[in-house]
């Protein structure tokens, strides 16, 4: 095994997970200067060596780090992906599943925006087995009417609850990164909420945030 960043140049996917968990105990933004400084130490070396694969970045604040990597490299932004709210979306599906007593694999739901305190649930898109939650709530209000604010907050604060219990949150985000990596390596055209460069969506451009994306061999399609 090599020990130089340049030896990663032929990889199809490189995952950036550098950080300092102690600085993010209260807020994901706490790692800002640590993680962006670390990114600057290796990202140019990787690209100068000829890297042309996909970057998946976990490090927080996820959207800022992804944006910084894009600024440093000038690389195709579709091939720089932040895990963003992919994990938060899974937590939202879990929160809904517990409330309506349906397997979360049957639920379609996304958290969007910043991977942080301002993220929000895309409620108008939530469905169970393809049927909109709004319609289910009309048909069976006792079972399917949710406190949306409470449910959304459960998803938003999920990572902090895990950290409060064991002072780390590595397994779930590792599984999320692995799932996105699989989508790239197998060219799956997989749908996920992940952090990508905004190019006019909702009037915003030039920075990363999470939207529903299709992920394949060329990154975000």
Language model regions located:
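Conserved N-terminal Rossmann-fold NAD(P) cofactor-binding segment
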Residues: 1-12, 26-27
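Conserved beta-strand termini and adjacent loop/short-helix elements that scaffold enzyme active sites
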Residues: 2-4, 83, 112
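Structural motif
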Residues: 12-13, 54
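Redox-cofactor binding/interface segments in oxidoreductases and associated redox assembly factors
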Residues: 15-16, 57
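Conserved NAD(P)H cofactor-binding loop of Rossmann-fold oxidoreductase domains
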Residues: 18-20
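N-terminal glycine-rich phosphate/adenylate-binding segment common to multiple enzyme folds
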Residues: 22-24
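Rossmann-like NAD(P)(H) cofactor-binding subdomain of soluble oxidoreductases
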Residues: 27-93
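C-terminal substrate-binding/catalytic lobe of Rossmann-fold NAD(P)-dependent dehydrogenases
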Residues: 73-79, 88-221
């Amino acid at each position: 095994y090599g020990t130089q960043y340049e030896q990663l140049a032929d990889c199809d996917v490189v995952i950036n997970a550098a950080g300092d968990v102690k600085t993010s105990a209260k807020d994901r933004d706490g790692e800002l200067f640590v993680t962006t400084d670390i990114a600057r130490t290796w990202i140019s070396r990787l690209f100068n060596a000829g890297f042309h694969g996909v970057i998946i970045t976990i490090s927080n604040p996820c959207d800022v780090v992804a944006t910084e990597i894009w600024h440093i490299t000038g690389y195709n932004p579709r091939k720089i992906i932040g895990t963003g709210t992919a994990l938060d979306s899974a937590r939202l599906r879990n929160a809904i599943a517990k409330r309506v007593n349906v397997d979360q694999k049957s639920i379609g739901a996304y958290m969007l925006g910043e991977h942080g305190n301002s993220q929000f649930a895309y409620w108008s898109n939530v469905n169970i087995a393809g049927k909109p939650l709004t319609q289910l709530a009309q048909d069976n209000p006792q079972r399917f009417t949710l406190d949306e604010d409470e449910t959304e907050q459960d998803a938003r604060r999920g990572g902090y609850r895990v950290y409060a219990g064991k002072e780390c949150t590595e397994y779930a985000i590792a599984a999320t990164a692995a799932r996105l990596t699989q989508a790239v390596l197998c060219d799956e055209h997989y749908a996920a909420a992940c952090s990508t460069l905004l190019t006019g969506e909702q009037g915003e451009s030039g920075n990363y945030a999470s939207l529903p994306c299709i992920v394949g061999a060329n990154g975000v399609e």
